[in-house]
Amino acid sequence: MTQGLFIMCPGQGGQHAGMFDLARTDPGAAALLDKSGIILDEATLFDNALAQPSIVAAALAVWEALRAHVPAPMLAAGYSIGEIAAWSVAGALAPLDAIALGRVRAAAMDDAARQGPQQALAAISGVAIDTAAALAPRHGFEIAIVNGYDACIAGGLASGLAALGDALAAEGGKLQRLPVAVASHTSLMAPARAAFDVALNALPFATPACPVLGGVSALALRSKGQAVDELSRQLVQTICWSDCMDAAVEAGITVALELGPGSALARMMQARHPQIACRSVADFRSIDGIATWVARQE
């Protein structure tokens, strides 16, 4: 049986109108999606209010369908909003509570964004992290997520995008605006913390069956206090996803599975740690196909 299973829960970017289809082939997962009350609307899939809870729901519905057919994970982690889903995968949060928390998080972040000028999130590639971190503040941006040696996400005011893009191009880098209207994981999200923290503290947390890697700290966390602190801080602090991948490998994982939607996390893991067997559920046509692949790994 496969040992060292690492479950990865994605953030925004890979959502699509059919992202519940695979999970709906399982009665239990279909029931969870029905109870969530989420109706996917292609026109608003990238709006926070729908995107965040639906991404949590998609990941947890697939996990509901899959978990009886794969070994218990040794570790879980989530990218941005995916960190909420990861705590549910670990057994600490009930799935419907996690989805509801995703709704609160989205609303709080949208409220924070409305308090000032238009915000933006953008992918930076082709320059070292140190270079990106030096250039971003000159144009009103902060590093939101570190994905690799020369890949990160930056958040800030939309008015500074063009100038930041020019500065990066002069250094051989590239800037691509993302379909996210809030500057996630930057100080601009500070007004979102109060409402989110109230909802977060009110939720019942069970003892997780496996640790969850904190997105900010890349530490293996197990308690409600640690979860509350990390989930709150990640609204306004940099997500160190590259460190999370490294920490998972150092912990001894042998197989990594992204729950989807999308396959961005699987691609990043494959690029950074090619020795790890890694796939996304988005690569498969059936729950049985996923379970069979996991079982074949050693």
PLM features: residue spans?
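Residue-level signal for well-ordered alpha-helical positions
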Residues: 135, 167, 268-272, 293
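Non-catalytic positions within long, well-ordered alpha-helices that form the structural scaffold/packing
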Residues: 249-252
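A short, well-structured juxtamembrane/interface segment
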Residues: 239-247
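Alpha/beta catalytic cores of group-transfer enzymes, especially the acyltransferase/condensing modules
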Residues: 90-235
